[in-house]
Swiss-Prot record:
The enzyme's E.C. designation: 2.7.7.6
NCBIfam families hit by this protein: PRK09570.1
One MF annotation (Gene Ontology) recorded for this entry: DNA binding
Function: DNA-dependent RNA polymerase (RNAP) catalyzes the transcription of DNA into RNA using the four ribonucleoside triphosphates as substrates.
Entries under PROSITE patterns matching the protein: RNA_POL_H_23KD
Record's subunit section: Part of the RNA polymerase complex.
UniProt-recorded name of the protein: DNA-directed RNA polymerase subunit Rpo5
Length: 82
């Protein structure tokens, strides 16, 4: 094998933008909605997008999606172990 081919998952048209929230952003999000991380939807650490970001269990991922009716909306997931 000549070399490892790298594929950037975030360049695919069907994959929305993902990013890891900072500790300050995480705290603000949880306070704003008066929730705990356990109340957020989960995303596994083995998810290709999570791996590409280098996120670890406990991190909160912000996902930015485009919608024809709502414009842009954000949703959040907490990274959990497999």
């Amino acid at each position: 094998m000549a070399g490892k081919s790298e594929f950037n998952i975030f360049k695919h048209v069907l994959v929305p933008e993902h990013r890891i929230l900072s500790e300050e952003e995480k705290k603000a999000l949880l306070e704003k909605y008066r929730i705990t991380p356990a109340q957020l939807p989960q995303i596994k650490a083995s998810d290709p997008a999570v791996k590409a970001l280098g996120a670890k269990p406990g991190d909160i991922i912000e996902i930015k999606r485009k919608s024809p009716t709502a414009g842009v909306y954000y949703y959040y997931r907490v990274v959990v172990e497999d």
